[in-house]
Amino acid sequence: MVTAVLLWITGFLIVCCVLLFARMSYEARLHAVTHSEVMMEGLPEAFDGCSIFFISDIHKRKLSNKYLQEFQGKADWVILGGDMMEKNVPLERVKENLEILSGVGQVYAVYGNHDLKADPEGLAQVLRDTGGILLRDQNIRLVRDGEEVCLTGVDQPLTKRDGYPDLPDLPDSDTKACRIVVVHDPAWIRFAPNKPDLILAGHTHGGQIRLPFFGAVRLNAFYRKYDCGWFRWYQPQSAVKLPQMLISRGFGNRRVALRLCCPAEMHLIRLKKGTADKLK
C-alpha cells in the first residue's frame, strides 16, 4: 500500500515537472505582439495615430518572416532596443532577422551590453547592409507632414562603471520638441537629468523566471521595481508632466530558452496626442 502511494506521488510529480517544463519552453518561444496605446501631450498632430514596432533582446532567436508579414504597413518605424545578438551568434542569422524587420518599417537601433561583448563592428555593418540606422548618443528627426519628433538613441556603456553620458543636446530651435528615447538598460533613468516624453527600454527580460506573488527571481532591487511593462513618474522640474517608459520582457532569452510567468514579447505601440491620464 505504501509503495503504491509513493509510486503515485512520484508519477504525479514527474507529470507536473514535464508540464511545467513544457509551459516554460512555450513561453520562451512565443512570437506574441503586445499592443499598446500611449498618450503624449507634446506629440505633433501629424504623428497622432502613428505606430512603432518595438523589439529588444533578440539574443539567439530567429524571427519568423511568415509571422511578421502581417505587420507590414501597420508600423511607421521599427525600433530595436539592443542585444540583437550575443557571443557565438552568427552574423548571418542577425542579418536574416534584420532583413525581416526592415520589411516591417525603417529600422533604428541601439547597442545592448551583449552586442558590445559579441561583435559590435560586424553588427554595425549588418545594420548598414540591411538599411538600418544605428544611434549612438545621437538624435534623428522623424518627419511627417512638415512636423517632427526627435528620436534619440542612448549608447550602452561597455561596463556599468563607465556610466551613461548626458542626452545629446537638441538644436535650440527644437528644445521643446517631442522626444522619444530608446535605451537598452532602464537603469539609465537614474542618471538622465531631463526625462523625455517616451522611453523605450529592454535588458531586464522581465526577470525571465517569475513566481506567482513573488515576482522575478533574479533581479536586484532597482530592476525589481522597474522590471517590465509601462511606468511613469512625475518630476516637478520637467516640462513633461508624465514621462512614460516601456520596459520590454524581450523576445529572446538568456542562458536557457525557458520562461515562467514572463512570456517573450514584441510590441506595437500606437502614439496618440492627448493627456497621459492612464497607460494601456
PLM features per residue range, with description:
Residues 37-53, 132, 140-153, 176-178, ...:
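Beta-strand-turn-beta hairpins that frame and shape the catalytic cleft
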Residues 1-46:
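N-terminal membrane-anchoring alpha-helices
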Residues 186-268, 275-276:
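Conserved beta-sheet core of the metallophosphoesterase superfamily
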Residues 50-141:
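Membrane-embedded segments
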Residues 76-78, 105, 177-180, 197:
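Conserved acidic residues
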Residues 86-89, 144-146, 162-163, 208-216:
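Short, charged, surface-exposed secondary-structure boundary motifs
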Residues 125-138, 144-183, 189-191, 256-260:
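Binuclear metal-dependent hydrolase catalytic cores centered on His/Asp/Glu-rich metal-binding motifs
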Residues 59, 85, 114-115, 139-140, ...:
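Catalytic metal-binding/acid-base residues of hydrolase active sites
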